[in-house]
Amino acid sequence: MKHNPFILVALFSLVSLFWGCQSSDIYQPWSKEKAKAWYAEHPYRAGCNFQPSTAINQIEMWQSATFDAATIDRELGWAEEIGLNVMRVYLSSVVWQNEPEAFIQHIDEYLTIADKHHIKTLFVFFDDCWNPESTYGEQPAPKPGIHNSGWVQD
């Protein structure tokens, strides 16, 4: 029997949500002492949006034909060198629909690289902004001077 990773993640999330809501103190604000203790245990978060320089959009970042671990490693290394420790990374439903196993493998590879550079990741699941049409495969060239010129609706 083949398991769908998306369904497993959704089921795990629902169970975790239900289990977490059983706590009676979940709705109580933290004391100043508890908040200060939590903050003292966590480094200051400094980061940015991340997409490797070799990818015009989230499809090129994640599809097998253009996934570029070497560039990701190099650029996350640069981020670490200047003190960044968190990245916001956009996922692609188009890649998920066309090659789900490879997509999960690429996410795992990205996370391994990010961990090597002590960088946490905030994934954005299937953003639906920017260019309304997206297609799997080769992507258009960037438009000079326009930020995210090839970003696609997801």
Where is each model-derived feature located?
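N-terminal Rossmann-like NAD(P)+-binding domain of SDR-like oxidoreductases, especially those catalyzing
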Residues: 11
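Bacterial Sec-dependent signal peptides at the C-terminal "C-region" and cleavage site
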Residues: 14-28
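Bacterial N-terminal signal peptides that target proteins for export
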Residues: 1-8
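Active-site mouth of glycoside hydrolases
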Residues: 25-154
